[in-house]
Amino acid sequence: MPNLTLPKEQPTLRVIPMVYDTNARGDIFGGWLMSQIDIAGATVATIRAKGPVATINVNKLTFEAPLYVGDVVSFYARVTRIGTKSLNVEIDVFAERNRQLDGEVVKISNAELVYVAISEPGKSRVIPQ
């Protein structure tokens, strides 16, 4: 496997999963990762939409490697498409294996989510250009 490095830009979100985030096998539960991906995606979508957004679709979600307790997990989110009321966000997830001395970086996941801009009462709204 090639030696990966983290992307040069700042991550949108960075977290360390804990023991209570594990599944029955002892690695990190996929649902936990999905929720963190959604948080990272919504962060950049909210900034670009200049207000609240709601997740309306997961176009793609791949699990490429397991996560473990103590990994330092970095989420890199970017807007890839802007429509009238919705926008697509791509999220790449990497882990620094905290328990290994060599600082191995592993690609964990890639996802594309769609968010719709909403008004305070929860109705869709136009995204400012």
Where does each model-flagged region fall?
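Extracellular/lumenal ectodomain signal focusing on beta-strand-rich modules
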Residues: 58-60, 110
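Hot-dog-fold acyl-thioester-processing enzymes
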Residues: 2-57, 116-129
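HotDog/MaoC-like acyl-thioester-processing domains
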Residues: 3, 7-13, 68-69, 80-129
